[in-house]
Design a protein with these regions (language model features):
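N-terminal capping segment at the start of a domain
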Residues: 3-11
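Glycine-rich flavin
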Residues: 22-25, 29-30, 35-137
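Short loop segments at secondary-structure junctions
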Residues: 84-85, 120, 146-149, 160-162, ...
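DPxDG-like acidic metal-binding loop motif
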Residues: 128-164, 180
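Glycine-rich, charged/polar anion/phosphate-binding loops
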Residues: 168-173
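Glycine-rich beta->alpha junctions and the first turn(s) of the following alpha-helix
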Residues: 174-176, 181-209
């Protein structure tokens, strides 16, 4: 694989130096691999999950962080298909393919630290979510939060540059990169009065295969 060989050339140096893998992300976007699993009718390649996972493993052989990011991208990209309506999934797929979006997530199910409340226009979130893979270089995010009163969990798909979102560079567990420099694939994300309309919700129907 051409990209695997390119990533291998300086993986160790990049790991030591830290920083966001923006050049590598640009290569992924140019290759079309970010849209690999989006159905062809929505502008993607329509490939199988087994193909995407094979590619993620190949990347991980030479660069663990990039393999991590590439694999997690697809889970967030397909969240609307799993949890939303068919119409929501189609809309997300079309816009993601057209924009060549890279996806991150802030949906760590083990953390009860991000809460939402309803207002006239939708929801307002406050709190923090650790282990938010890919959020530091993402175009779009899958977000999950709990209701303070009911503990009910909600999901949404929103732009990563939404006002009120602050991406931290604080992951320090896997020893895969220098977290203080932003190279870690799993930083935390803070939300301060971050607003979401009800149209961005991607939950409320049974999970679909």
């Amino acid at each position: 694989m051409r990209l695997r060989e390119i990533f291998a050339r300086d993986a160790a140096e990049r790991d030591r130096a830290g920083g966001k893998p923006l050049e590598q992300l640009a290569l992924l976007k140019e290759s079309g691999l970010l849209n690999l699993l989006i159905p062809t009718e929505f502008g993607g390649a329509g490939e199988r999950w087994s193909t995407a996972l094979k590619i993620a493993r190949e990347f991980a052989k030479v660069d663990g962080a990039l393999g991590h990011l590439y694999g997690y991208h697809f889970g967030s990209q397909h969240a609307a298909h799993l949890r939303g309506t068919a119409e929501q999934a189609a809309d997300i797929f079309r816009r993601s393919a057209a924009g060549n979006w890279f996806w991150g997530n802030t949906a760590n199910s083990f953390s009860k630290s991000l809460f939402g409340r309803r207002d006239a226009d939708g929801f307002v979130l406050d709190g923090f979510r650790p282990f938010t893979s890919g959020s530091h270089i993402a175009d779009y995010l899958q977000v999950a939060w709990e209701d303070r009163d009911t503990n009910a969990r909600s999901f949404a798909a929103i732009p990563a540059n939404r006002d009120g979102i602050r991406i931290e560079n604080d992951w320090d567990a896997s020893a895969s990169a220098k977290p203080e420099a932003g190279a870690s694939p799993t930083p935390g994300s803070g939300f301060i009065e971050t607003r979401y309309s009800t149209t961005s919700l991607t939950a409320g129907v049974p999970i679909r295969p």
